[in-house]
Amino acid sequence: MADSSRGTYWITTFGCQMNKADSERMAGILESMGYCAGSGEDQADLVLYNTCTIRDNAEQKVYSYLGRQARRKRDNPALTLVVAGCVAQQEGESLLRRVPELDLVMGPQHANRLDTLLSQVEAGQQVVATDDHHILEDITTARRDSSLCAWVNVIYGCNERCTYCVVPSVRGQEQSRLPQAIRLEMEGLAASGYKEITLLGQNIDAYGRDLPGITPEGRRQNTLTDLLHHVHDVKGIERIRFATSHPRYFTERLIEACAELPKVCEHFHVPFQSGDDELLKAMARGYTTARYRRIVEQIRKLMPDAAISADAIVGFPGETDAQFRRTLELVDEIGFDLLNTAAYSPRPNTPAADWPDQVEEHVKVERLKELNALVERKAKACSQRYLGRVEEVLAEGINPKDNTQLMGRTRTNRLTFFPAGSHRVGDTVPVRIEQVRAFSLSGSAQAQPALVR
């Protein structure tokens, strides 16, 4: 447990899994400095917002939170106020003009330098750190939110230039960690009792493009496929997942490896964004709907029970009703287990934000509503296949609504509830599924020999 010689801290995280992983590392740094986790942001001595700028509503929420803490700091000058993440990177110095009470503004490439930057704050400086920074040698020990499941960053940044996306400008160019370093981190996690690892990257299929080495066959020596083989035999790790994938780089070789390696879970998150080829071209996504359908076909051919989740955008500039209907058709055809949906939000410094044919907000709202209704219907249909089956569930915690139940996830990432009985958090339990909902399952624990996959 961290000591409290410097007081308490509170971190609020907005956005993606990458941000959550960064927040865990920053929490680890703060505890190594002598801070301890507080009970709430309004009581903490240091408040840090790890921000997201992927959509405008997330960004505006940050400013609302900041306004409250700025008022608090005017009454309590000893409060340390930090903005990290993508809004910090995007806005930089202008954040200080908007919120002069801030002590530190730091982009995501500087998350592992939090201790160094705070030492400058303690010396009386108001600090902005948004310059490009090579981060791979700066990996720090994280304070994990879970004691069983951990994120492991394998590649930072993104070299894609999707016309709607601000990520490359705020997270920088791709930087891949060495396979040996990733394996070493996983071995340390296994020694600490972790059972499930999710390998993380903004565009994880691009892993290794910046690393040297060519095989005799002429392909890159370090790919995500090679990495999965390299880390698969880490003792103690029972499950391996990875996210987020890009259809342009999602290869048949990768799919075959996932089918062959028993620890790799049968769950794939592969965003498609639109079901219309003209819009995909305008988005600069680099693939067609036919290519996306082939990926799904290959996954289901080798892993018939695999779960497939994705992301989709409605209301992209120029989207016609006919083009939106093609997105609905794709969703209806594939039947995603989960689909993260969003109305297009113009982001600063992206080409699509300046295009003249912006879709009206009320049209976006109606399209999003229609898509979400279809998503729920298809998810309910997907859930039916689990009824009566026995699924392997890693018990991650106690059901907050019923403390007699444990909850965890199947290998296909379905949230599942079951009576605890003699089982405890951390057990891997065969559960017979007796009730299905759109996005969760319920059942009862079975004797170990009943486990089938």
From Swiss-Prot:
The keyword Iron-sulfur applies. Residues 144-381 form the Radical SAM core domain. Its cofactor is [4Fe-4S] cluster. It catalyses: N(6)-dimethylallyladenosine(37) in tRNA + (sulfur carrier)-SH + AH2 + 2 S-adenosyl-L-methionine = 2-methylsulfanyl-N(6)-dimethylallyladenosine(37) in tRNA + (sulfur carrier)-H + 5'-deoxyadenosine + L-methionine + A + S-adenosyl-L-homocysteine + 2 H(+). [4Fe-4S] cluster 1 binds at residues 16, 52, 86. Residues 384-447 form the TRAM domain. Pfam families: Radical_SAM (PF04055), TRAM (PF01938), UPF0004 (PF00919). One of its GO terms (molecular function) is methylthiotransferase activity. Its EC number is 2.8.4.3. GO terms for biological process: tRNA methylthiolation. Its main location: cytoplasm. Monomer. Catalyzes the methylthiolation of N6-(dimethylallyl)adenosine (i(6)A), leading to the formation of 2-methylthio-N6-(dimethylallyl)adenosine (ms(2)i(6)A) at position 37 in tRNAs that read codons beginning with uridine. Belongs to the methylthiotransferase family. MiaB subfamily. This is tRNA-2-methylthio-N(6)-dimethylallyladenosine synthase. The gene is miaB.
